UniProtKB/Swiss-Prot annotation:
One of its GO terms (molecular function) is 5-oxoprolinase (ATP-hydrolyzing) activity. Keywords: ATP-binding, Hydrolase, Nucleotide-binding. GO terms for biological process: carbohydrate metabolic process. The keyword RNA-binding does not apply. Forms a complex composed of PxpA, PxpB and PxpC. The keyword Nucleotide-binding applies. Catalyzes the cleavage of 5-oxoproline to form L-glutamate coupled to the hydrolysis of ATP to ADP and inorganic phosphate. It is an enzyme of class 3 (hydrolase). It catalyses: 5-oxo-L-proline + ATP + 2 H2O = L-glutamate + ADP + phosphate + H(+). This is 5-oxoprolinase subunit A. It comes from the Bacteria. Its EC number is 3.5.2.9. Belongs to the LamB/PxpA family. The lineage of its organism: Bacteria, Bacillati, Bacillota, Bacilli, Bacillales.
Length: 256
């Protein structure tokens, strides 16, 4: 039976600023928790880990650039050495909360500009993969399907999960359409569900240029920061079940 993971970025509040709907945890199988650089703070991280454990969803670190004002979505001129340190630091911070709450960390997914840059920059991708491997080689590395990050993870022996997006359009080279392009976001729920089913069943996606692009889909990213997102997550969850597609998170590699 074909299986798919549904993941969402979570714990992206900071101080009195609140972002995210807890209800979405009923319809996802893994969460990527902000680690304090682009969003999140120690109290938010602890509470988010507790929520994830209560709902039985897989817990992952969501490291980003140190850019609270830009929410980690602004590109930064950084070296691979800096990226390595950023990722190790953030995984370590979240891992401490996960351990304190009696949970298990399963994966790592970079955030925002770091994710997008590592999709195309082999040196940054290798730095991220090495950081994950050095902290815990049993962690699963999430990255854009067909990206340098997925290649780097596989090259260093990590298990990887190729990620696709329900509400984003694609370019002919398999990259995401930049948010600056008015065609970047899929607002129509029917269109988004159709795209997800095509990516899972047919292993392809229709680009904005009109060409079909081959794609691997191990995990689908959903956004959980508004009421509409919760409704869509429920709808997609039901559509996958109706198609006989099992919904489950990738498992950590067993220690040998």
């Amino acid at each position: 039976m074909r299986t798919i993971d549904l993941n969402c970025d979570f714990g992206e509040s900071f101080g009195v600023y609140r972002l995210g709907q807890e209800e979405i945890l009923s319809y996802v199988t893994s969460v990527n928790i902000a680690c304090g650089f682009h969003a999140g703070d120690p109290l938010v991280m602890r509470r988010t880990v507790q929520l994830a454990i209560q709902h039985g969803v897989a817990i992952g670190a969501h490291p980003g650039f140190p850019d609270l004002f830009g929410f980690g979505r602004r590109a930064m001129a950084v070296s691979p050495e800096e990226v390595y340190a950023y990722v190790v630091y953030q995984i370590g911070a979240l891992a401490a909360f996960v351990k304190a709450e009696g949970g298990v960390m399963t994966h790592v997914k970079p955030h925002g500009a770091l994710y997008n840059m590592a999709a195309k920059d082999a040196a940054l991708a290798e730095a991220i993969a090495k950081a994950v491997h050095d902290v815990d080689p049993m962690l699963v590395l999430y990255g854009l399907s067909g990206s340098e990050l997925i290649r780097a993870g596989r090259a260093c022996g990590l298990r990887t999960a190729s990620e696709v997006f329900a509400d984003r359009t694609y370019q002919a080279d398999g990259s995401l359409t930049p948010r600056s392009d008015p065609r970047a976001i899929i607002a129509d729920e029917d269109e988004a569900v159709t795209q997800v089913l095509m990516m899972i069943r047919d292993r392809r996606v229709r680009s904005v240029q009109g060409t079909d692009v081959a794609i691997e889909a191990d995990t689908v990213c959903l956004h959980g920061d508004n009421e509409q997102a919760v409704r869509f997550a429920k709808r997609l969850y039901q559509a996958l079940q109706n198609e006989g597609i099992a919904i489950q998170a990738p498992r950590r590699e067993e220690r040998r």
